[in-house]
Amino acid sequence: MTASTPVAQTHIQSLPLLHSGKVRDIYAVDDERLLIVATDRLSAFDVILPDPIPDKGAVLTRVSNFWFRKTAHLAANHLLDTPPESVVAPEEADQVRDRGVVVRRLQALPVEAIVRGYLAGSGWQSYQRDGTVSGVALPDGLRQSDRLPEPIFTPTTKAAVGDHDEPISFAQTVERIGADLAERIRTIALEVFALATEYAESRGLIIADTKLEFGVTPEGEPVIIDELLTPDSSRFWPADAWQPGATPPAFDKQYIRDHLEALGWDKRPPAPHLTDDVIRQTAEKYREAERLLTR
């Protein structure tokens, strides 16, 4: 298996498969650890697309690990130092090399922590309707891609594969996970976003918004899980191409979303196939985001 061979699905027999998500396959190592393998699957509008993107899973893993290390002083994360090759059979090592991580086994919270620094995507659509995003009132007169006065926390539900995440207010988040956890994940998410924003800007990138996911320890402590500040979970823009009122080119899934929108797809399975050129350009955008962030 080479880096250029897309990995749409893993086939690890030495560990039990617990879950196959939009991008990641999750295996049980033991009662306290999981093996998470980022495949090259790509989802858009909560639908898995039929064509994998070469090397995407490895890029996501490297970028996530970069951010997990960079933000470890702000928030606990699920990453362990165990090499993924050490928990699978020798003949399966190629499947996890560069794209697998061994992590703490935690209870996932049923919400996703979205932080927005700019008005884009579904946030812009919501603002156009009623001037709010996830119950957060914003000033009048903002334009698409405008920088917000300050970053805002706009959580969503955590949908099953094939379903859509739905925006919820902070009060609804409290109803789902309790006031203490809701406050803590909001604080952590905003602090991580602030650090990442400052760093990315020094590299010529804008992080318009991002999604964090959290688990909890048996003691009730929040821990960042899944991925962190990747091109799948974030909207990255080149700073020199940003201007309010327009959508900048993006180093993330927005290129695919725009392509699918142009096709007139109804955003329901099955998704249309991607052309070879779209696959190639998407792979290059992921690699470029990694280069700019981690060089």
From Swiss-Prot:
Keywords recorded for this protein, A-Z = ATP-binding, Ligase, Nucleotide-binding, Purine biosynthesis
Q: What class of enzyme is it?
A: ligase
GO terms for biological process, alphabetical: 'de novo' IMP biosynthetic process
Give me the gene this protein comes from: purC
The pathway this protein participates in, as annotated, is: Purine metabolism; IMP biosynthesis via de novo pathway; 5-amino-1-(5-phospho-D-ribosyl)imidazole-4-carboxamide from 5-amino-1-(5-phospho-D-ribosyl)imidazole-4-carboxylate: step 1/2
Q: Name one GO cellular component term.
A: cytoplasm
**InterPro entries recorded for this chain?**
SAICAR_synt/ADE2_N, SAICAR_synth, SAICAR_synthetase_CS
Q: Which Pfam families match?
A: SAICAR_synt (PF01259)
Which Enzyme Commission numbers does its entry carry?
A: 6.3.2.6
Q: Which reaction does it catalyse?
A: 5-amino-1-(5-phospho-D-ribosyl)imidazole-4-carboxylate + L-aspartate + ATP = (2S)-2-[5-amino-1-(5-phospho-beta-D-ribosyl)imidazole-4-carboxamido]succinate + ADP + phosphate + 2 H(+)
Q: Give the record's family classification.
A: Belongs to the SAICAR synthetase family.
Please identify the protein, giving its name as recorded. Phosphoribosylaminoimidazole-succinocarboxamide synthase
* Species whose genome carries this gene: Halorhodospira halophila (strain DSM 244 / SL1)
Task: Enumerate the GO terms in the molecular function aspect.
Answer: ATP binding; phosphoribosylaminoimidazolesuccinocarboxamide synthase activity
